[in-house]
UniProtKB/Swiss-Prot annotation:
Localization in the cell: Cytoplasm
UniProt biased composition (Polar residues): 48-60, 71-93, 127-152, 419-428
UniProt keyword annotation of Transcription present: no
Protein's name in the database: Transposon Ty1-JR2 Gag polyprotein
Induction statement: Ty1-JR2 is a highly expressed element. Induced under amino acid starvation conditions by GCN4.
InterPro entries reported for this sequence: TYA (IPR015820)
Keyword field: Cytoplasm, Phosphoprotein, RNA-binding, Transposable element
Region (RNA-binding): 299-401
Species the sequence originates in: Saccharomyces cerevisiae (strain ATCC 204508 / S288c) (Baker's yeast)
Extra facts: Retrotransposons are mobile genetic entities that are able to replicate via an RNA intermediate and a reverse transcription step. In contrast to retroviruses, retrotransposons are non-infectious, lack an envelope and remain intracellular. Ty1 retrotransposons belong to the copia elements (pseudoviridae).
Oligomeric and partner information: Homotrimer.
């Protein structure tokens, strides 16, 4: 009777599946098919736990006529919690949840190849400039799970596909705090460079080397969304995304500017701590250099007060400026401007003393005139020989005249002659030479 009732209801109802499920006789009597149905429900519960890494069939898949005869594999593929994969490029926030990567344990353990996140991001065609994603990583939802009996692609073949272009690229870690964003963005930029996307990263002037494509922008958005959850982003990043949620390039540009600012701050502190001044450069240039460093640090939130600044400046003074360490160290309220007044005073005094010393070069015409009026000590033979010859000739003439007069004079005796020959002869010349007769 029960089999006849079921056959009658099958012709009236819309389908045998609906009649067999809604019939009370099925529940009151123990049908052998109930055992397979209970197993099917257990398989459905087990499949909901594995749906985080497994995929579902497309919406166009055929529905079996009788669910009692449906296999466990078919029930797993049609999980009530997961529908067809949305055909869109943007990933949802649930995909960024680490629990969604139960097969790998954590997103950081997923082996990434250069510039790939999902096969749908790559332009179609055999001449794609980006390597395709292997079947073992980033599989679509239609792929059955390992528990269903089907295994993934062989690891050796997957390795050959992924290493044909480049080795695995390690993804950046998950951002867990807004304070860690400066360090995280450095690893994210490194990840883009290893993924053959270094040309789209902004340079020092804020412009990339080349124009970013739509596929690259999609990859940039999805990777940033996965590894940098919105609840852990800094306020300034959220402000940029509130205007345009896809403007990741602006976030990278601002981050690079902040990195350069941090590097400049470190360089300014090192420069200020190693100041050296001895007057070799103008005092104005030294003051401008120091004040600019202090102003930059103060504007960036690193406050340098007058006491610390004066101590750093005085520690680098040397030469005549060194005594300022001892004359100014007792003034507690001394400012940087007052210290530079003393430095300027010493520098101007040095410049004045240098200008007072004659350091001009004499003209050659002046040297010739001086050689004519003054005796040149470097050439004594040229200057002293000619006058000596003239004086000698004069002395011989005078001596002969004296001898002749002495012989002709009757009052002159031998004593006077001997006296005149023994006494030196006085010659009226400008050299005042004393000559003896014996020498001639």
């Amino acid at each position: 009777m029960e089999s006849q009732q079921l056959s009658q209801h099958s012709h009236i109802s819309h389908g045998s599946a609906c009649a067999s499920v809604t019939s009370k006789e099925v529940h009151t009597n123990q049908d052998p098919l109930d055992v397979s149905a209970s197993k099917t429900e257990e398989c459905e519960k087990a499949s909901t736990k594995a749906n985080s890494q497994q995929t579902t069939t497309p919406a166009s898949s055929a529905v079996p006529e009788n669910p009692h005869h449906a296999s466990p594999q078919t029930a797993q593929s049609h999980s009530p919690q997961n529908g067809p994969y949305p055909q869109q490029c943007m990933m949802t926030q649930n995909q960024a949840n680490p629990s969604g990567w139960s097969f790998y344990g954590h997103p950081s353990m997923i082996p990434y190849t250069p510039y790939q996140m999902s096969p749908m991001y790559f332009p179609p065609g055999p001449q794609s400039q980006f390597p395709q994603y292997p079947s073992s990583v980033g599989t679509p939802l239609s792929t059955p799970s390992p528990e269903s009996g089907n295994t993934f692609t062989d690891s050796s073949s997957a390795d050959s596909d992924m290493t044909s272009t480049k080795k695995y690229v390690r993804p950046p870690p998950m951002l867990t705090s807004p304070n860690d964003f400066p360090n995280w963005v450095k690893t994210y930029i490194k990840f883009l460079q290893n993924s053959n996307l270094g040309g789209i990263i902004p340079t020092v002037n804020g412009k990339p080397v080349r124009q970013i494509t739509d596929d690259e922008l999609t990859f940039l958005y999805n990777t940033f969304q996965i590894f940098a959850p919105s609840q852990f982003l800094p306020t300034w990043v959220k402000d940029i995304l509130s205007v345009d949620y896809t403007d990741i390039m602006k976030i990278l540009s601002k981050s690079i500017e902040k990195m350069q600012s941090d590097t400049q701050e470190a360089n300014d502190i090192v420069t200020l701590a190693n100041l050296q001044y001895n007057g070799s450069t103008p005092a104005d240039a030294f003051e401008t250099k120091v004040t600019n460093i202090i102003d930059r640090l103060n504007n960036n939130g690193i406050h340098i007060n007058n006491k610390v600044a004066c101590q750093l400046i005085m520690r680098g003074l040397s030469g005549e400026y060194k005594f300022l360490r001892y004359t100014r160290h007792r003034h507690l309220n001394m400012t940087v401007a007052e210290l530079f007044l003393d430095i300027h005073a010493i520098y101007e005094e040095q410049q004045g003393s240098r200008n007072s010393k004659p350091n001009y070069r004499r003209n050659p015409s002046d040297e010739k005139n001086d050689s004519r009026s003054y005796t040149n000590t470097t050439k004594p033979k040229v200057i002293a020989r000619n006058p000596q010859k003239t004086n000698n000739s004069k002395s011989k003439t005078a001596r002969a005249h004296n001898v002749s007069t002495s012989n002709n004079s009757p009052s002159t005796d031998n004593d006077s002659i001997s006296k005149s020959t023994t006494e030196p002869i006085q010659l009226n010349n400008k050299h005042d030479l004393h000559l003896r007769p014996e020498t001639y």
